[in-house]
Amino acid sequence: ELLGLELFDINAKILITNPTYPVYLNGTYALSREVSFLPIKEEDNFLPQIPTKKYDIIYLCSPNNPIGIAYTKEYLEKWIEYAINNNSIILYDNVYHDYITSPDVPKSIYELPNSKKTSIEFRSFSKSSSFTGVRCSYYIIPNDIDKDINHIWKLRTLNRFNGTDYIAQKGALASYDKESKEIINYNIKYYLDNAKSLKDTFLKYNFKVWGGIDSPFIWVK
């Protein structure tokens, strides 16, 4: 799928945070796209700073992989404002949304005003339901964003995708069962408890630690 880049002009200016999920960068290189990097710095609490230059496509990941920090509503509103002012598209990786526990962190970017005009969100069943290697994910492309993007995506999918494999489909469907939801919630709490235990241990020995609250992983210095 190359993370949706096939939807956009080859000359589009792409912004990717550093560090981030490496597939973003690999996908852009596979399509011979030019990429700019936005450093995520400790002094900014690993929050990407809003750029002063114009970019057409911005990759944001929340909870961030690999740092583990999730972005608040107040913070994301600044990115949406930037996208509106610069006619940009935010590609919003939200595959760990079920791990979010903080009340000021949205479970979806679409909780925020004007986000449907600026953002394409992608999610995954496999992270929440513990079958990451099997793979089952989906995009949300609002009609408000641009009437042509949804149409082009459907044409692209019809011609280049034969469908999710049957095992993954059954796993995704089963995740909506009442019994499955109980197991999924138990597992998510288990993973978050493990992350908290690791975080507390590192903090005890005076390491600096981020993440582990709205994500099942931590970043240690």
Predicted regions and their residues:
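Conserved coil-to-alpha-helix start sites within the AMP-binding
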Residues: E1, T20-Y24
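Phosphate-binding glycine-rich loop
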Residues: E1-K13
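A short helix->loop->beta-strand "cap" motif at the edges of active sites that frequently abuts
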Residues: A12, R33, N85-I89, K116-K117
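Active-site phosphate-binding strand-loop segment of PLP-dependent enzymes
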Residues: I40-P103, K107
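Conserved core segment of the aminotransferase class I/II
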Residues: L112-K189, K196-D200
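Conserved glycine-rich beta-strand-loop-beta hairpin in the small C-terminal domain of fold type I
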Residues: L173, I188-F202, K208-K221
